[in-house]
Amino acid sequence: MARTKQTARKSTGAKVPRKHLGNKSSQKSFPSTQGLKKTHRFRPGTVALREIRRYQKSSELLIKKLPFQRLVREIAQEFKTDLRFQAAAIQALQEASEAYLVGLFEDTNLCAIHAKRVTIMVKDIQLARRIRGERA
């Protein structure tokens, strides 16, 4: 079939409806994504840095009180039964425990960074405790 030259035509101004090539069933087969909005996601690490800044600013306890209290009572049960604790005693134990854990994780993070990693591992905790002199 030979090609023919296209010539410009003058438009009449009236809109002519276009013919749809496919039938209606083929149009419905694709789900419409017009109403769905994509959920916003932060880049990896952004939320972690925000949480670090938030917890460094605050002075509240990081572990919930009741689970910590149950843990203390469970450990104390192994040594002596029917022990009672004052609320201030459990509060003091929790403050000391959290201070110890935060310090340990800081040292652990330094060990991971020294090994050119950003993820802490068990060997980092072991090294931090060994340097501190807690474990030979």
Curated annotation (Swiss-Prot):
Q: Which Pfam families match?
A: Histone
- Which residues does the record list as N6,N6-dimethyllysine (modified residue)? K5, K10, K28, K37, K80
GO MF terms here are: DNA binding; protein heterodimerization activity; structural constituent of chromatin
Indicate where the modification N6-methyllysine is found in the sequence.
K5, K10, K19, K24, K28, K37, K80
One annotated Gene Ontology cellular component of this protein: nucleosome
According to the UniProt entry, which residues carry Phosphoserine? S11
Q: PTMs?
A: Acetylation is generally linked to gene activation. Different methylation states of H3K4 mark distinct developmental phases. H3K4me2 is associated with euchromatic regions. H3K4me3 is a mark of active chromatin. set1 is responsible for all mono-, di- and tri-methylation of H3K4. H3K4me facilitates subsequent acetylation of H3 and H4. Methylation at H3K9 and H3K27 are linked to gene repression.
Its domain of life reads: Eukaryota
Region (Disordered): which ranges?
Answer: 1-41
Q: Where is the composition biased (Polar residues)?
A: 23-36
Give residue numbers for the modification (N6-acetyllysine).
Answer: K5, K10, K15, K19, K24, K28, K37, K57
Tell me where the signal peptide lies: none
Main localization is nucleus
List GO BP terms, alphabetically: asexual reproduction; cellular response to UV; chromatin remodeling; epigenetic regulation of gene expression; nucleus organization; protein localization to chromatin; regulation of mitotic cell cycle; response to cisplatin
Q: Which SMART domains match?
A: H3
- Location relative to the cell: Nucleus; Chromosome
Matches recorded under InterPro entries: Histone-fold, Histone_H2A/H2B/H3, Histone_H3/CENP-A
Instruction: Tell me which SUPFAM superfamilies the record gives.
Output: Histone-fold
N6,N6,N6-trimethyllysine (modified residue): where? K5, K10, K28, K37, K80
The job of this chain, per UniProt, is described as: Core component of nucleosome. Nucleosomes wrap and compact DNA into chromatin, limiting DNA accessibility to the cellular machineries which require DNA as a template. Histones thereby play a central role in transcription regulation, DNA repair, DNA replication and chromosomal stability. DNA accessibility is regulated via a complex set of post-translational modifications of histones, also called histone code, and nucleosome remodeling.
Family to which this protein belongs = Belongs to the histone H3 family.
Subunit record text: The nucleosome is a histone octamer containing two molecules each of H2A, H2B, H3 and H4 assembled in one H3-H4 heterotetramer and two H2A-H2B heterodimers. The octamer wraps approximately 147 bp of DNA.
Q: Which PANTHER family match?
A: HISTONE H3 (PTHR11426)
Identification of the protein by name: Histone H3.3 type b
